[in-house]
């Protein structure tokens, strides 16, 4: 199963470990097993690291310090310990302790601005979650025993995390090679008690010495190489990269769930996700995506070819448009890229990324460039390109649902009332275009813009932290697009359910009017034929008038039915005109009654597949975001409630959804969906003819 669902397995593991970390509140840090979920939990302050007490880990730390001191005792030169830095490495000094202070001076050069909003937190500072992520990554790297950083120094950083103290770090100024020098220098300055560095706790910002004193912590003094060992690494880039990858995995899964919902809302076909198509082009991501969406459509009464045989005489589009039909081929490669990005970041989290590196087994010190964070840059650029691809697909799907010419019978702008006065989703459509334009811009690479730095010593540098920042921006934009898509999909599903119910009731009502009016004049066989033709006409004609106001739609429906009636009824024209008047009134009454009963108790979830049903119920029941009834929903000073609930702007409702995505509560719901998918076993025979998915798309799951 893992080979078929590699991305889902990775995402599920992430969600489960995050839940576990939150439950336990702590985890062990040993230099080799830091998980992306650990970084996220630390950043969000739901779990704190504790240092491993493994004697091997402790010994490794001390051994690296001993090797360094042995080199110094022999009078050997060690870069950054008794030499200058970077392009100034041709200088020498015996003042090894002072040299680490000089390193802090040359790297604590970032800009923090005075806030203009009265906040205590300086402007242009790094978000505190990102700083905490960097802190735990740096501690984990130091624990590997390659940096000549002693245990008390690592404990000092851990103590900040334990006490909820976060260094205030400038946002810009690192080229991420030689590591993230500037950001990590401010972390180091905080544990030193540098009075011009700041620490934050619960929104309160104090100079580091005072904050340490209030927490009962003492400043530390850096030994030879300990300053360099703390700042010469990729921790800021890798830490933020971990946060980005975690969110990207979740958004990838949500995008697939939303695609399943769009298939249902647009009455698309499940055939696009048939396992035969994926097997014929066996890219792992495509196979997984097709399998996932097919599972999400299980039990759907809206998607074609799920609970009914394939319609081989469709009179509308013979196949779905690309935004639905090519979803596995579009999303699949991005899942593969996200897995590689995850691997790159996971390796980086458990790597020694500074220079020089101490090998205590050979008692040697090696010069290299493990601080060159190009692996993180590579991961981040894959992530934000994937985000752009997801956004592009969601935008296309949203446009199809909102555009009356593309939606297959949904009303214009997904307005539940009269489209001449109600433009429900039009603004959302504009927002989506704005988000998509920005997301496309953000997808551009950072790596192609690097500049030579520091006496041309850093002639190539990764700009990994900047790349991660841009990827985080892309995550933010896609999160907004997903929130809009969730709102749009749920509205479209409600309207589809509402209009299907109306068509069913209107067809019955019209059949009754025909029988009452013409049964005495038309023989039974002819009458039955007329009723069947009217039924087909209502289904087809109603969907063609989505731009009209509702009463006009009812009139148009009956007007366009007149030729059918005339062909079957050879009666007085007055009878037919009278029937037309009655039929319009009957259909209008059916609409008003259907709308009223639906608004009071929507039955949409009964029609949905496994994926969209879970998402829909979460939005409607857990979040309390209702079916949007149109113009009447708009809040004004003298009209603030509807059906005993507060009215909100459309943006207000979407914001509620956005917060559930941003804070992760939506994924607590989707976790059950992921677990259901992973528990589904394949029952392939030798020729694959009995693939579970073939049964799934008929609503039969064999577990």
UniProtKB/Swiss-Prot annotation:
Protein name: Phenylalanine aminomutase (L-beta-phenylalanine forming)
NCBIfam families referenced in this protein's UniProt entry, alphabetically: phe_am_lyase
Gene3D superfamilies: Fumarase/aspartase (Central domain), Fumarase/aspartase (N-terminal domain), Phenylalanine ammonia-lyase 1, domain 3
Functional note: Phenylalanine aminomutase; part of the gene cluster that mediates the biosynthesis of the mycotoxin cyclochlorotine, a hepatotoxic and carcinogenic cyclic chlorinated pentapeptide. Within the pathway, cctP1 provides the uncommon building block beta-Phe from Phe. The NRPS cctN initially catalyzes the condensation of L-serine (Ser), Pro, L-2-aminobutyrate (2Abu), Ser, and beta-Phe in this order to produce isocyclotine. After the dichlorination of Pro2 catalyzed by cctP2 to produce isocyclochlorotine, the cctO-mediated transacylation of isocyclochlorotine can furnish cyclochlorotine.
Gene deletion effect: Abolishes the production of cyclochlorotine.
Catalysed reactions, semicolon-separated: L-phenylalanine = L-beta-phenylalanine
GO cellular component assignments: cytoplasm
Family named by the database record: Belongs to the PAL/histidase family.
């Amino acid at each position: 199963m893992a080979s078929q669902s590699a991305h889902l397995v990775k995402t599920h593991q992430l969600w489960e470990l995050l839940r576990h970390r939150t439950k336990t509140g702590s985890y062990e840090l040993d230099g080799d097993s830091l998980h992306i979920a650990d970084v996220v939990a630390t950043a969000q302050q739901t779990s704190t690291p504790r240092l491993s007490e493994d004697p091997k880990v402790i010994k490794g730390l001390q051994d690296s310090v001993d090797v360094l001191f042995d080199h110094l005792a022999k009078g050997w030169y060690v870069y950054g310990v008794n030499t200058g830095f970077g392009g100034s490495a041709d200088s020498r000094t015996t003042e090894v302790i002072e040299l680490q202070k000089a390193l802090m001076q040359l790297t604590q050069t970032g800009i923090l601005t005075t806030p203009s909003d009265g906040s205590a937190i300086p402007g242009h500072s790094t978000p505190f979650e990102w700083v905490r992520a960097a802190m735990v990554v740096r501690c984990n790297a130091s624990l590997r025993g390659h940096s000549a950083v002693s245990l008390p120094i690592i404990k000092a950083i851990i103590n900040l995390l334990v006490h909820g103290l976060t260094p205030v770090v400038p946002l810009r100024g690192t080229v991420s090679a030689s590591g993230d020098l500037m950001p990590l220098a401010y972390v180091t300055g905080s544990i030193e008690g540098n009075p011009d560095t700041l620490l934050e706790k619960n929104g309160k910002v104090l100079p580091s010495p005072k904050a340490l004193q209030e927490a009962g912590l003492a400043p530390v003094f850096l030994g030879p190489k300990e300053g360099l060992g703390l700042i010469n690494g990729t921790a800021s880039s890798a830490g933020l990269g971990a946060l980005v990858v975690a969110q990207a995995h979740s958004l990838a899964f949500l995008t697939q769930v939303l695609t399943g919902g769009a298939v249902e809302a647009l009455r698309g076909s499940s055939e696009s996700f048939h396992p035969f198509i994926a097997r014929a082009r066996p890219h792992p991501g495509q196979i997984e995506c097709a399998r996932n969406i097919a599972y999400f459509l299980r039990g759907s009464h809206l998607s074609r070819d799920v609970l009914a045989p394939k319609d081989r005489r469709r009179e509308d589009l013979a196949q779905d448009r690309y935004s639905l039909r090519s979803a596995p081929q579009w999303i699949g490669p991005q899942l593969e890229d996200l897995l590689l990005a995850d691997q790159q970041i996971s390796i980086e989290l458990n790597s020694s990324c500074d220079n020089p590196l101490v090998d205590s087994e050979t008692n040697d010190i090696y010069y290299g460039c493990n601080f060159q964070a190009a692996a993180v840059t590579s991961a981040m650029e894959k992530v934000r390109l994937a985000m752009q691809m997801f956004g592009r697909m969601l935008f296309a799907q949203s446009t199809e649902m909102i555009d009356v010419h593309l939606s297959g019978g949904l009303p214009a702008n997904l307005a539940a009332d009269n489209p001449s006065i109600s433009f429900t989703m039009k603004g959302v459509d504009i927002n989506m275009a704005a988000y998509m334009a920005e997301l496309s811009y953000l997808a551009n690479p950072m790596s192609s813009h690097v500049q030579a730095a520091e006496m041309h010593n850093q002639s190539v540098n990764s700009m990994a932290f900047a790349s991660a920042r841009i990827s985080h921006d892309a995550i933010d934009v896609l999160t907004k697009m997903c929130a809009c898509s969730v709102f749009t999909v749920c509205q479209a599903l409600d309207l589809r359910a509402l209009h299907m119910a109306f068509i069913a009731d209107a067809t019955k009502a019209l059949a009754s009017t025909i029988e009452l009016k013409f049964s005495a004049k038309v023989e039974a066989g002819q009458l039955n034929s007329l009723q069947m033709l009217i039924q087909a006409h209502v289904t087809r004609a109603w969907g063609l008038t989505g731009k009209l106001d509702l009463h006009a739609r009812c009139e148009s429906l009956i007007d366009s039915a007149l030729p059918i009636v005339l062909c079957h009824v050879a009666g007085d024209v007055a009878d037919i005109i009278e029937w037309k008047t009655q039929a319009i009134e009957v259909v209008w009454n059916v609409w008003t009654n259907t709308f009223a009963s639906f608004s009071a108790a929507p039955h949409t979830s009964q029609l949905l597949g496994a994926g969209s049903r879970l998402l829909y119920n979460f939005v409607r029941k857990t979040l309390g975001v209702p079916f949007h009834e149109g113009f009447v929903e708009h809040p004004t000073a003298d009209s603030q409630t509807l059906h005993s609930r507060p009215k909100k702007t459309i943006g207000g409702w979407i914001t509620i959804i956005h917060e559930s995505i941003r804070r992760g509560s939506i994924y607590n719901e989707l976790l059950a969906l992921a677990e259901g998918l992973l528990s589904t076993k394949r029952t392939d025979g030798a020729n694959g003819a009995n693939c579970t998915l073939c049964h799934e798309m008929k609503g039969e799951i064999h577990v």
